[in-house]
């Protein structure tokens, strides 16, 4: 894979009251800033992928092979809480009023999966779309192909 475009993806997980009903079932994996220990114990996907419990160097090595990693956030997104998760941001622990941007996270600062290296080398891109979750204006997909595939 040369380029990875994540369109409104929950990089740091999602949070919200609807997820209270089965947050740690095998088909639902939410990130709860108020129950961080439980999240780290029961979430079998993001804790591994984002090096929150252990770190698999293969994840970093594979990400660093990318020519471009594009993170797209929807500015009017009400499905993803917080919408900054699309750019690896998330709520502060035990504080759903404060958003920690990617640059202030351990994941970035310690370069656990290669985000810092990608950004410093100009291969990590942040795009925003003035719309609701996954509502792409006409022609946007083709613009992404032109910018990042050639």
Regions from the PLM with identified roles:
Residues 1-41, 79:
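Serine-dependent carboxylesterase/thioesterase catalytic core
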Residues 31, 52, 90-94:
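Surface-exposed loop/turn and secondary-structure junction residues enriched for glycine/proline
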Residues 15, 26-39, 54-58, 129-139:
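Active-site rim elements
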Residues 20, 51-54, 149:
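Generic surface-pattern signal
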Residues 35-60, 108-113:
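Active-site nucleophile elbow and catalytic-triad environment of alpha/beta-hydrolase enzymes
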Residues 9, 45, 50, 55, ...:
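Internal, well-ordered interaction modules that form the hydrophobic cores of assembly/scaffold domains
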């Amino acid at each position: 894979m040369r380029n990875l475009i994540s369109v409104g993806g929950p990089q740091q997980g999602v949070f919200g009251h609807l997820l209270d009903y089965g947050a740690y079932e095998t088909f639902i994996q939410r990130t709860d800033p108020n129950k961080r220990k439980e999240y780290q114990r029961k979430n079998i996907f993001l804790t591994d992928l984002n090096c929150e419990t252990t770190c698999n160097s293969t994840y970093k090595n594979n990400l660093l092979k990318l020519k471009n990693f594009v993170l797209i956030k929807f500015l009017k997104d009400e499905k993803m809480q917080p919408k900054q998760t699309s750019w690896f941001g998330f709520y502060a622990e035990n504080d759903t009023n404060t958003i920690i941007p990617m640059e202030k996270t351990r994941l970035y600062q310690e370069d656990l999966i290669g985000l810092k290296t990608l950004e410093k080398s100009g291969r990590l891109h942040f795009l925003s779309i003035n719309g609701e979750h996954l509502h792409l204006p006409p022609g946007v997909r083709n613009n992404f192909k032109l910018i990042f595939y050639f």
